Amino acid sequence: MRILITGGAGLVGSHAAEYFARKKWNVVVLDNLMRSQIFGYDKGSVEYNWRYLGQYRNIKRIKGDVRNENDVKSALGKGVDVVIHSAGQPGVPSSVRVPLEDFSINAFGTLNVLECTRKKSPRATIVYCSTNKVYGENIDKISLKERKTRYVYKDRAGIDEDMLTDLTGHTPYGVSKLTGDLYTQEYAHIYKMKTGIFRMSCIYGARQFGFEDQGWVAWFIIATLKNKPITIYGDGKQVRDLLYAEDLIRGYEAFINSKLQHGIFNIGGGHENTTSLLEFIDEIEKLLGKRPKMTFSNWRPSDQKVYISDISKIKKILGWQPKISVKEGIKRLSDWVVKNESYFS
């Protein structure tokens, strides 16, 4: 089997590349290594995953941009069996600062990958890495109850795939990812391509170089270890379901191996793998023996108070469920950060 993974140097992409390389697939990763320019952090950390993947002989690394037709066609080569499109601009605050760049990467980049794949590998399975942000502020219309350390849904366990995506605000990031989501659906309908759309909740794992704009799970651990201050936007009671990257990739694999022609799945840790920011900080203290320096600020636009994925659909249809608990996953990430402390300034 031959697989192309866009955004192969990112958290999701690098975990996917390693996962399938270990299964003896021929893996091609495409990445422009431009995260440092978008987010303004150290380029050395951006290239860590790129170098890490170099240890696998069956991973071919190509520096290129998903917006460039020639780059994508070159990565596709004579054809592939699977495309995992994880490349993207992943930060909500960044999308507000540079909306044109955000749209160019997330919307046009996705369309370019779809069209190039249609021309060179029309029978390939395409996995699109979408996001819960496609639901926008509709999430905030759900009734909540406030408890000591977290908010909880008043009358539901989680968000399913029938949640509305329109008639609400999204942020530029939510709009650009929804555009890619809809285009991927359309390529399934009009061109009969096999496509799986995974609307991800909070994904984390080893080799995650988090910072304030993106990757908060890793950022909180890194900041605590390096004695850097963190800002809590809101009251810290906001809740997310966490999913370790390896578990996410198993979900992709389940779809790839299935007979489904098209599917849309909310994917995350589900109601059994949730944490609030305040609870997460308590967990950090248990692991590192200290708490981060914290300040509180106003809520950020479209920052959902609670987002928990209803994963019953993917459980039923693909037989998938998380294996790595939040406690175990956070320890894995924390151990990796401590071991690689020198990479964090």
Model-derived segments and their meaning:
Residues M1-I203, K331-R332, N340:
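N-terminal Rossmann-like NAD(P)+-binding domain of SDR-like oxidoreductases, especially those catalyzing
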Residues D235, I264-F265, L278-I281, G289-V306, ...:
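C-terminal "lid/loop" region of Rossmann-like NAD(P)-dependent oxidoreductases
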Residues L178, Y191-K194, I203-W219, K226-K228, ...:
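Glycine/proline-rich active-site loop of Rossmann-fold NAD(P)-dependent oxidoreductases
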Residues D71, N112-E115, L242, D247-R250, ...:
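Conserved mid-core alpha-helix of short-chain dehydrogenase/reductase
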